Amino acid sequence: MVGSASSTEREKGFLDVIAQFPEIKILSEDKYSGATRDTAYSASQNILNRYGDELDGIFMPNESSTNGMLLALRSIGRADGDVKFVGFDGGDQNVQGVISGDLQGIIIQDPFKMGYSAVSLMVQHLAGKSVEKRVDTGATLVTPYNLKNENIQKLLFPPLEEYIDKK
């Protein structure tokens, strides 16, 4: 797997869990889709051309790959829920994909919590206190059913005015 560490870890986590379901056949797990929506679109078209009707579900590990696959599915008329599709990261196009039903879900994180935890742990570490080697800051599955939830809306569209010093 080539790409960013976060995408690689997301892919590994996905594959580790899917391995617990032997009835699910993985058709492709080693296709790097590139760092942009355009390269992801091209790679996604190749996957769709190669596997066509064999595809029942798709997971993409980051915003650009999710965007590219969404465009590719739309271009062949299969973005109607025919292929179950879950991607990672928010962003306007992914949120619109959930609203339209073209994406069954997106997994999002809490960037404020991630940043706050990182700084807090670094301060503790520099003060000589022991800290956990690994900290899970959580992830949330966003679907058409919970998209309008207030907490999810804050994760998708952070109220920056609450965090930015207005001096």
Predicted regions and their residues:
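Hydrophobic alpha-helical
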Residues: F14, S28, S33-G97
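Short beta-strand elements at the ligand-binding edges of bilobed clamshell
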Residues: M1, E29, S100-F112
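Hydrophobic alpha-helical segments within soluble ligand-binding/sensing domains
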Residues: T8-D16, R37-A43, G91-N94, Q109-A127
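Flexible loop/hinge segments that line or gate small-molecule binding clefts
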Residues: G91-Q104, Q153
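Short beta-strand->loop
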Residues: M1-S6, F21, D30-G34
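Extracytoplasmic "Venus flytrap"
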Residues: M1-E9, M60-E63
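Hinge/cleft segment of the Venus flytrap/periplasmic-binding protein
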Residues: V2, S6, V17-I18, K113-K167
